[in-house]
Amino acid sequence: MNDLTRYKLTAGLPVPAGAKLIYCYLLDVSDRRGIAISVRQLGKSIGLSRSATRKNLHRLKHMDMLDIAPRYSEDGGRLSNRYRLK
């Protein structure tokens, strides 16, 4: 599926505008491996609060449109999640 088709499908999703905005932003900035970005940085980039960003990311995950993979440093510290569009 090409990007234009994904944008068109996004318009018809039964989700809030914030979720559509996140999906389109990730579509623009991510590659096949996805993108590693913090919820805070993602929200700041698109103008949403951290809580709204987090809720909408989980909505997209439950709709099976997004994979969320946790990342850890070598010493076990928590890093930002990796988001990959399906």
Feature locations, PLM:
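Short recognition helix of helix-turn-helix/winged-helix DNA-binding domains
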Residues: M1-S45, S51, M65, G76-S80
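Winged-helix/helix-turn-helix nucleic-acid-interaction surface
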Residues: R54-K86
